[in-house]
Structure formats: C-alpha cells, structure tokens
UniProtKB/Swiss-Prot annotation:
Mutagenesis or variant effect for H445N: In a breast cancer sample; somatic mutation
Organism: Homo sapiens
Annotated protein name in UniProt: Fc receptor-like protein 3
Taxonomic lineage: Eukaryota, Metazoa, Chordata, Craniata, Vertebrata
Glycosylation positions in this chain: N561
Residue ranges of every copy of the Ig-like C2-type domain listed in the record: 21-98, 99-182, 192-270, 284-369, 383-470, 476-563
Short motif ITIM motif 1, span: 648-653
Assembly and oligomerization: Interacts (via phosphorylated ITIM motifs) with phosphatases INPP5D, PTPN6 and PTPN11. Interacts (via ITIM motifs) SYK and ZAP70. Interacts with IZUMO1R/JUNO. Interacts (via extracellular domain) with IZUMO1; the interaction replaces IZUMO1R/JUNO as IZUMO1 receptor after adhesion between sperm and egg.
Length: 734
C-alpha cells in the first residue's frame, strides 16, 4: 500500500461553490403559531446585511405577493418565503393562525441540534391552569403545570407535540387540548457533496478531494469538522477542520468509491455525502503479441499447448486474458506486474482447434493481439463398418455398399476394405467422414468383412461384420418313386422335390392338380419327400414348388396313372391260383404214372417199350395234408404208403398271420412195385419243393382308406410273402 502524502488546507467550508446563500426569514413575535385575529411581522434579511438591499420578493404558498418591502405583516396562515437581490430563496416558514381556545407555540427559527422552547397559551391565559406537554401522545417528563418547557437537541423528524390545560368557566374547570404541532426544524448545514479534481486521474498524477457543504448564515458560530473515505477506509488523519484533502499521486490501488462526512464539533449533527466512483488511469499498454508453443500452432490431440501474451510497453499492473473464437468467456486471466504472461492448456482436444488472440489491459482499455490459428490433428477412432443393401437379406446380384467411417479423426482419411483377409480396395475421404466400396454380390461373397482407417497418425481396424448372401432357389425337379414301373392302388408313392441351387431353409410344396398336398422344410441339401398311399383318385398331374423367401420356383408337371388292382392282392391271388393249377397238374401226372405202372404188372399188359393204357385211379393220390415219398431201397411189392413227415426246414414264412392261403407242389418217389403200377412217376430221387404264398383277404367292412392303410402297413412284409422251402423228406428217409 502506497503512503498517503496529505496536504491539509485549513479553510473551513462555508458555502457550496456556485450557489448563492439563502435569504433569512424572521418572525416577530418569534412564534410560528398565533391566535386568529392577531398579526405577525415577517422580516427578510441577507448574510451581508441585516436588512435586504433593493426590492424584496415575498411568496405566500408559492404565489408572488405584490409587496416588495423587506418587512410585512400577515394575518393569514400558510407558507411564506422571501428572496433578495443578493440571496437565493429562503426556506419556507409555516405560520398558523388558530381559532382554538388553546394553542402550542414553538420558538422560531429552530435549527438541527438546537434546544427549542415550547409554550402552551390560552386565549384567556389568566383563567388557564394545569398545563401539560406531550410528544407523540406521551407526556414529556417534568412538564406539568409549566408555562413553557425546553426540548433539547431537536432533529428534523415528524414528531408531533401538543398540550392540555384546564379552562376556568364560571365555577367549572374544563380540560382543553391544543392541535398537534410539528416543529419546523431548519438544516444547520446542507448535506455534503464530495468533489474530485478528476474522476479519472492518470496514474501518478495528483488529485484534490473537497467535501462541500453550507452552514446556515444564522449560525455562523457553529464549528464543523470533516473526514474523507475510500470504500470503508479513512483517508488522511481522520477528522479535520479542513474540507479538502490533496493526494500527491494516484495509483491504480487508489481506484474505488469515495465519500465524506461532516459533523459539528459537538457531535450533535452528522451528515454523509453520496459515493463517487474514481478510477485511476494508467499508461496504456501497446503492441500486444500472442505466441503459441509448439511453434506454428500445429498440435496432435493429447499434447500440451502454451499461449504467451506480451506487451511492448505499459505501466503498472497489467491484466492479461486469452480468448478463443466462438467462446464468450475468456480461457484465462492473469493480473501481474509484468510485460508478459503464459497460459498452459493441458492435453489439447479437437475442440481446442481454432483461432486465438490475447488482450492486455492496465485499467485503461484492453488492447488485442492479432489472431493465430491453432490446428489440432485427431488420430482416427476405430472405424465402424456398415452394409447398405437394397433389402434386409442380401441376394445374389444385389449391389452391396460397404461403408466405413471413423467418427473422429482429422482428414484426409484413407479407408481400406477387406473380405476375410483379402484386400478388396481402398477409398479416401479428403474432407473427413466415411468412404464406401461397392460389390455386386455372388454366393462367394458370403463371409466376414472389415475395414481400417488411417490419417497418418496410426491406423485403426474395425470389428468384423458377417455377411450372408442368399441364393434364390432354382427350378425344382419332381421325381415320383413307386415300387414298380406301373403304379397301382395300394402302392406307397414317394414324391421327391429338389432344387439344386438355393440358400437354406427351403420350403417345398407338393401339389396334385391344383390341390396342395402338404409342405416340408429342408434345412440342408437333398430336397424333400412326401409319401402317398395310392388310390385310383391319385391319378393325375403332380408338381412341386420351392421357396426360400426370395421367390418361389415351380417344377414341371409329372403325370401319374394308377391302375385299379392292388399290387399285393394281385400277386397273392396269382400265386394262389398258380399253386393250385400246379398242384392239380402234379396230381394228374402222379395218377397217370400210377396207372401206367399197374398196367404193366397185369398179364397181357404193355411191355416196357410199349404204351399201355392205365387207369388213373390205380395210382394212389398222396395226402394233401402231409406230403411223403417212397424210399427206392424198399421192396417193390405193393403196400400202403407210409405216412410222410416234413423236415423242419421252413424259412421266411409268416406264422403270425392267421389268414394265409397256401398251395403245395410235391412229388413222390415210388418203390419198384409202385413204379410198375405208376409208370408215369419219376424214377429218380428228387427233392420235394413246397411253395408258400400268402394271399391277403379283403375285409368287407374295410373302407378304401383303411384298405390303403393296411396295404402301406404291410408293404414291406409283402415283399417276403413269396418263399421257397428247399426240401420235404419222406418218413422213410429218416
């Protein structure tokens, strides 16, 4: 804090500069209240003379009176003022003429801090007694039954005074109250005004402060003292008889709010001035310059930056501030006794790029530097690869756009595109943003894609994105698979539909004429099949359709003709009939041979080389229930055939079915005797062969559907219904 060098001018202030002193208005008698009908004399005087020189102007309730004497008499109540040639208008004096019986009078003039005399007066004062005085409704102490009292150190407030008394009316005492009285207290001195030789002094120059006031000319003997302040700090030595304070040199620290106080030496009255703002001006700074490190203002995100602001000249404390284009508030501010200052910006970001300037201010006005551009290069962020296709699921032939974009990164940015680990190509984004690469899709384009971005500050790779290229189905081929070349009722028909190309899953639909038979979804290759147990109604045109969501493809039509007889029933019936016919033929042959043999044994029979007739009845017909044969080593005489036993050599015969129909073919080896009787029988040992054929019965109560179902259920078993058992031996073989 600088030392104050004070020069006190010991000249008391008597008047405010440039303002003429007020005229003085006096009353005679010196009471401001009188009874109605009485007269009061008004006297106008100036400071230099007891009476006014020249014309005197009188005003009653602000209206100019025609009287121009320095002394007048009045009988009307109101506010009176006067003015002379060498003075300004006096303060107003209110004179009251009361019609009341009791009045309260105050001595005039009365100034702030004076002791004032109050007098309670009745029209017939001799018959008035027991007077009491009140202030604001409260009785004043020691004021009972007094003709007059003194009120000490009055002030300019709104206090109301009145008095009460008893009036003698014949033999009665009547209490009477006066009207309230507001004492007209005049200012002892005016409110002070602080004046400075300059409100904006130059730093280092002197300044004079004056606390101006005006003492009432009617109280020239009153002594005043003065004190000056800056903000809340007392200047100089405190209270002084001089209203002036001279400061040899003003500095910026002396800027602030100034005010002063004036009081009587008795401390009875004190008044304060309004505040005045004084700012000390410095030698202005010049040639402000901004420098940036690293030199040139080229930075990479994450580096530190230093902004250096300097001035070529300027005095005192300088306030430096740094600013960026587009920001309202400054980046920083420093105040110091120096010609330069630095601002450190740590870990610069992309938002720190732009134009900068600095300002220097030493309480005069800020001086700005030139603009400097700062460039912050941003390494690319991890790019994001996105696919842009005409539809949600890409299809062969679609034009796919691969878009790679880094949300952060200084341009230019070079983007490279990859399928699996193979480079597809690259594209540059000169002004930032993303880049695209187009592909016309084939099935081979399915797989993982990625991209990377590089702006020279380090490449960044995207996450892999998987692409599945969907292949539309080709035209399907419908194949009919039946047990035989000709489809018959009861066959199990397989409809097989297959598209050789197309992405899975594929939904296959099967149609008979225009009716939908059903559908099957295939999640892998090989097509799909649909089975039908055929009836005559299944003849007609068949087709199928393949669809994987990219458009259905229809097969060519295949025609099927179903014949009316069931394949199983026809086979079994034919086998039964064939077996029966063969059995009859064998029996007939056996009978002929037997007859031939008997004919040869009879006298006169046929010779071995001749042909003789024989009766078929002479040959014994074998039993149809148990087949047998003759051992050729036995005697040849005729005897009954021994019963035949079958060897247990049955295979693939369905014993569980209760409805088989069997046919039996068997041959008999005869003895010599039998051979002679049955010449047509074979003479050599032969194996007896038995053919079994199962013929299914048709149930009368079966519907067409049930019959078809039965046929399908036993379709595989029917394939084993035609079997041969190799041998059946005669009992004699054992």
């Amino acid at each position: 804090m600088l030392l104050w060098l004070l020069l006190l001018i010991l000249t008391p202030g008597r008047e405010q500069s440039g303002v003429a002193p007020k005229a003085v208005l006096l009353l005679n008698p010196p009471w401001s209240t009188a009874f109605k009908g009485e007269k009061v004399a008004l006297i106008c005087s100036s400071i230099s003379h007891s009476l006014a020189q020249g014309d005197t102007y009188w005003y009653h309730d602000e209206k100019l009176l025609k009287i121009k004497h320095d002394k007048i008499q009045i009988t009307e109540p109101g506010n009176y003022q006067c003015k002379t040639r060498g003075s300004s208008l006096s303060d107003a004096v209110h004179v009251e003429f009361s019609p009341d019986w009791l009045i309260l009078q105050a001595l005039h003039p009365v100034f702030e801090g004076d002791n004032v005399i109050l007098r309670c007066q009745g029209k017939d004062n001799k018959n008035t007694h027991q007077k009491v005085y009140y202030k604001d409704g409260k009785q004043l102490p020691n004021s009972y039954n007094l003709e007059k009292i003194t009120v000490n150190s009055v002030s300019r407030d709104n206090s109301k005074y009145h008095c009460t008394a008893y009036r003698k009316f014949y033999i009665l005492d009547i209490e009477v109250t006066s009207k309230p009285l507001n004492i007209q207290v005049q200012e002892l001195f005016l409110h002070p005004v602080l004046r400075a030789s300059s409100s904006t002094p130059i730093e280092g120059s002197p300044m004079t402060l004056t606390c101006e006031t005006q003492l009432s000319p009617q109280r020239p003997d009153v002594q005043l003292q003065f004190s000056l302040f800056r903000d809340s700090q007392t200047l100089g030595l405190g209270w002084s008889r001089s209203p002036r304070l001279q400061i040899p040199a003003m500095w910026t620290e002396d800027s602030g709010s100034y005010w002063c106080e004036v009081e009587t030496v008795t401390h009875s009255i004190k008044k304060r001035s309004l505040r005045s703002q004084i700012r000390v001006q410095r030698v202005p700074v010049s040639n402000v310059n901004l420098e940036i490190r690293p030199t040139g203002g080229q930075l990479i995100e994450g580096e530190n930056m230093v902004l250096i602001c300097s001035v070529a000249q300027g005095s005192g404390t300088v306030t430096f501030s740094w600013h960026k284009e587009g920001r309202v508030r400054s980046l920083g501010r420093k105040t110091q006794r120096s010609l330069l200052a630095e601002l450190h910006v740590l870990t610069v970001k992309e938002s720190d790029a732009g134009r900068y300037y600095c300002a220097a201010d030493n309480v005069h006005s800020p001086i700005l530097s030139t603009w400097i551009r700062v460039t912050v290069r941003i390494p690319v962020s991890h790019p994001v690869l996105t696919f842009r296709a005409p539809r949600a699921h890409t299809v062969v032939g679609d034009l796919l756009e691969l878009h790679c974009e880094s949300l952060r990164g200084s341009p230019p940015i070079l983007y490279r595109f990859y399928h699996e680990d193979v480079t597809l190509g690259n594209s540059s984004a000169p002004s930032g943003g993303g880049a695209s690469f187009n592909l016309s899709l084939t099935a081979e384009h399915s797989g993982n894609y990625s991209c990377d971005a590089d702006n020279g500050l380090g490449a960044q790779h995207s996450h892999g994105v998987s692409l599945r290229v969907t292949v539309p189905v080709s035209r399907p081929v419908l194949t009919l698979r039946a047990p035989g070349a000709q489809a018959v009722v009861g066959d199990l028909l397989e409809l097989h539909c297959e598209s050789l190309r197309g992405s899975f899953p594929i939904l296959y639909w099967f149609y008979h004429e225009d009716d939908t038979l059903g559908n099957i979804s295939a999640h892998s290759g090989g097509g799909a099949s649909f089975n039908l147990s055929l009836t005559t109604e299944h003849s007609g045109n068949y087709s199928c359709e393949a669809d994987n969501g990219l458009g259905a493809q229809h097969s060519k039509v295949v025609t099927l003709n179903v014949t009316g007889t069931s394949r199983n029933r026809t086979g079994l019936t034919a086998a039964g009939i064939t077996g029966l016919v063969l059995s009859i033929l064998v029996l007939a042959a056996a009978a002929a041979l037997l007859h031939y043999a008997r004919a040869r044994r009879k006298p006169g029979g046929l010779s071995a080389t001749g042909t003789s007739s024989h009766s078929p009845s002479e040959c014994q017909e074998p039993s149809s229930s148990r087949p047998s044969r003759i051992d050729p080593q036995e005697p040849t005489h005729s005897k009954p055939l021994a019963p035949m036993e079958l060897e247990p050599m049955y295979s693939n015969v369905n014993p569980g079915d209760s409805n088989p129909i069997y046919s039996q073919i068997w041959s008999i080896q005869h003895t010599k005797e039998n051979s002679a009787n049955c010449p047509m029988m074979h003479q050599e040992h032969e194996e007896l062969t038995v053919l079994y054929s199962e013929l299914k019965k048709t149930h009368p109560d079966d519907s067409a559907g049930e019959a078809s179902s039965r046929g399908r259920a036993h379709e595989e078993d029917d394939e084993e219904n035609y079997e041969n058992v190799p041998r059946v031996l005669l009992a004699s073989d054992h």
